Amino acid sequence: MKTIRILALHLAYGGVEKAICSMANLFVQRYPVEIISVYDMPNAPAYPLDEHVKVRYLLKDRPNQKEWRAALRGLRPISFLRESIRAVKVLVGKKIAVRRTIRSIHDGILITTRHEDNLVLSKLGDPRVWKIAQVHEDHCFDLNYLDGFRHGYSGLDVVVMLTPGLAREVRQWIPAGAKTRVVSVPNFLEHFPEPFPLEKKEKRIVAVGRLSWEKGFDRLLDCFALTREKHPDWSLRIVGDGPEQEKLEQKIAELGLGDAVVLTGRLSPAGVEEEMKRASLYAMTSLSEGFPFVLLEALSCGLPCVAYDVRVGPAAVIRPGLDGVLVPDGDREAYAARLMELMEDDARRLEMAREAQLHARDYSREKVAGIWETVLEP
């Protein structure tokens, strides 16, 4: 039987990493599965893995962005130089390890999950290997992506995008005559929470994600601040950690939101679920998304979702008016207004919460498994 190998950057917390673990748990029901993780991060795997899934790590060295930034901010030239050298060493080591690993695999199915690794698989992958490349983000018409699609993906058997729209776009950039097939396979939920009484949810908005610029949590704070005068009894909880934490803490203070906004830090999957079950609304203000896993989780917990309608992502999940609201990207006043409409209408919010839970079932493992079967076999 063919072995499925999945190449991951790491298995710590993150939407891509959760999707990888979910895929492995699905595939291992029918195939031998191995996850090849470039980095061996602390507390990884962060998400449950079937005991039959093998995990192999390529490097002991880990990325050192946190230490590098600390040295830069602290104006410590010796530490900065040391961390810069270490960063280059880690980067070069990663590139060598990925290329060596892809060259070493001569049978079965190999799935890469990052654009730069997809290019290596296309170029160096053994013809006897069934080569599948996943793209987990919106390419945003970035020239690096477009050039890769046009000139670097022809050696792949299948390219997996997360939405039909992204698949249509990428399909037109793959050269005519190439064997490469482009398909759409969404993320899926392995687990559905135990029912929580919708009537007992608190006057709380929740948002989850890495505290990095592309998640746009600064935009969420601006929007939430506009609701405070009319709804001082509502709170906002942002779950996650990351490089923007200090900036967000400063912004919370500047906006006078210290008594209403909590940055919880990173929580376990069970902790995230508990936050979602107790909240009444989910808020997303990302600058870009691929197929937001976190929106599926929010729907499954009975959370109507309010999101900026960025190019792709939220629109692939949210059904406007039924289980959420899409707001023109960047329109703070409109976003705050939509939040307040739902804050003020308990009956509508509860109906949307029920619809959200029903919609989440469309992304069960059983429903997506059939799509994957058409991808895994020639």
Q: Each PLM stretch: what is its role?
A:
Residues L287:
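Aromatic "clamp/platform" in nucleotide-sugar-dependent glycosyltransferases that forms part
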Residues R266-L267, E274-A279:
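Short alpha-helical donor nucleotide-sugar binding micro-motif in glycosyltransferases
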Residues G14-S22, K203, A207-E229, L236, ...:
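A conserved mid-protein helix/loop that constitutes part of the nucleotide-sugar donor-binding site
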